[in-house]
């Protein structure tokens, strides 16, 4: 009895923990639900329990990916669907990157430009705007300038002022038009000589040297003197050059003066020309009429013919 009483006392002293109402309600709901709905609910509960751990992992991996992308210049917008990247930045099998992917420094510039500024309201690229919006570019440009200044050779700075002038006239600038034309002729001569043409250039070298200082005219304004004449002789290999043999001449005996005919000078030679079918002068000789008389007769004949026919629209004036 004592043992039994002690057990009862212990049971009354420590009441059993009551189950939570929420679980009991859920269990009651699950009884009424179908099997598929119960499986879905269990999955959701499992996801909720594991969510904080997964969320922490995702945050760490996203931060690591962002660092790697910034370091290697990978485009941040990996995208979704066909061209999406996996968590490690690799292209998934069967998925390709688009052709217009911007990488490297261009991607950084593009992201910098896009931030907070619409493409319509972008400021023009001046020094002030570069300092304001792209300080990294400004620093890079300054570093490049410093490097260029350091690379300049010291020997160039020690040159005399006369050599450092930009407006120095070259030594060969004193060529005149005649000298240039002489060079042109020689070039033309070599061009023709290579093609089997013999060229004889008649050039007065002394005159050319004298005119170098005196004349400074342009090539197309030079006077046509004996300085630019070219005589070209073309070889004809088909023609056979044989030495001309002197044929024996037949010497005629002189005819005495009394045998020559004197009547040849008296006869008038008719000049050769186009033979006419009739004599023009014969027309006037045969008729003995003037042209006015002839046309007058024709007019009268025409008038009589028209009068005999009757009225006509034409009036002949005699």
Swiss-Prot record:
GO terms for molecular function: mRNA binding. GO terms for cellular component: cytosol; nuclear speck; nucleolus; nucleoplasm. Keywords: Acetylation, Isopeptide bond, mRNA transport, Nucleus, Phosphoprotein, RNA-binding, Transport, Ubl conjugation. It is found in: Nucleus, Nucleoplasm; Nucleus speckle. The modification N-acetylmethionine is found at residue 1. The keyword RNA-binding applies. Residues 1-27, 163-183 are annotated as: Disordered. Residues 163-180 have a biased composition (Polar residues). InterPro entries: FYTTD1 (IPR009782). Its main location: nucleus. The modification Phosphoserine is found at residues 24, 61, 118. One of its GO terms (biological process) is mRNA export from nucleus. A motif (UAP56-binding motif) lies at residues 27-45. The modification Phosphothreonine is found at residue 14. There is a cross-link at residue 261 (Glycyl lysine isopeptide (Lys-Gly) (interchain with G-Cter in SUMO2)). There is a cross-link at residue 140 (Glycyl lysine isopeptide (Lys-Gly) (interchain with G-Cter in SUMO1)). The keyword Phosphoprotein applies. Belongs to the UIF family. Interacts with DDX39B/UAP56 and NXF1; interaction with DDX39B/UAP56 and NXF1 are mutually exclusive. Interacts with SSRP1; required for its recruitment to mRNAs. Interacts with CHTOP. Required for mRNA export from the nucleus to the cytoplasm. Acts as an adapter that uses the DDX39B/UAP56-NFX1 pathway to ensure efficient mRNA export and delivering to the nuclear pore. Associates with spliced and unspliced mRNAs simultaneously with ALYREF/THOC4. PANTHER family: 40-2-3 PROTEIN-RELATED, UAP56-INTERACTING FACTOR. This is UAP56-interacting factor. The lineage of its organism: Eukaryota, Metazoa, Chordata, Craniata, Vertebrata. The gene is FYTTD1.
